[in-house]
Amino acid sequence: KKIYFYQKDLSLPDALKNFKKVDIVINLASLTDAEGSLKIKNQIYKNNLGIFNNIIKYCKKKSSKLIHISSTSVYGEQKGLVNEECKKLKPKSPYAEIKVKEEKILKKNINKIKFVSYRFGTISGVSKGMRFHTAINKFSLYAALGKPLPIWKSMMNKPRPYLSLRDAFKVFKFTIEHNFFNNETYNILSNNLTLKKIIDYFKKYKKIKIKYEESKLINQYSYKVSKNKFTSKAISLNSNIENDIKSTLKMLGSINNEV
């Protein structure tokens, strides 16, 4: 089949008016830097929430199914193992706040649209359009350039959910092929890892330096995110984050820090 690409500003109300029949919408049109969103709160609210509202309106009008991408960052500060039943979400950034708002909007429209909402962990892995603001990809770039890895010292032993692109693709494929639109929310991650574990992976393949920093987004508690709800109903998610680090460093192996 032919694939067509259209460049559209989805924040405009009529951006989708010429698309007459769309079976499934995958909404990836968001600014995604959680820490960076602190500096552009108004912009990210206007962009991300504006786009989401336009897409919801379109899906309702055209009866299109929606794959909604949320984030595990909606949990904020928690204790122990958290799952989708967690009632007290504590987002720590404008980006995460918007994801909570989007999920609430979906619940209000639960009888008007078919959807599935996925709370993605932090992405890792090689892609043609990859970005480098997420932890593992950023560390890979810095390591390749010989720069010190910017590490939040207070987070060294606190696990966080990470998602390999390989698993993300598997989720999209499964959802479409199995018509997995049951108007529910699922955590999507490959593994929970501490910064210490991630740094150990890097040390296997690269001589690295570390620079300790403080972040504006500091969680006081250590917690893990459960993926059992999705894996028990759908498919296993177990791609190796270490392999993502290895392949990313290999891809970046030819770059240097010369200007």
Residue ranges and their predicted role:
Residues S71, E103-S127:
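Conserved beta-loop-beta element that borders a ligand/cofactor-binding pocket
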Residues I123-S127, I151-Y162, E184-L193, S215-Q220, ...:
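Glycine-rich Rossmann NAD(P)(H)-binding loop
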Residues K227-N228, S239-V259:
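Amphipathic terminal alpha-helices
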Residues N27, N53-P94:
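Conserved Rossmann-fold NAD(P)-dependent oxidoreductase catalytic core, especially the SDR/UDP-sugar
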Residues K39-N54, L89, S93, E97-I98:
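Glycine-rich NAD(P)-binding loop of the Rossmann-fold in SDR/ketoreductase-type enzymes
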Residues F139, A143, V171-I218:
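Mid/C-terminal beta-alpha module of Rossmann-like enzyme folds, strongest
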Residues Q7-N47:
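NAD(P)H-binding glycine-rich loop region in Rossmannoid oxidoreductase-like domains
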Residues V100, S124-K138, L165-R166, F174-Y186:
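Glycine/proline-rich active-site loop of Rossmann-fold NAD(P)-dependent oxidoreductases
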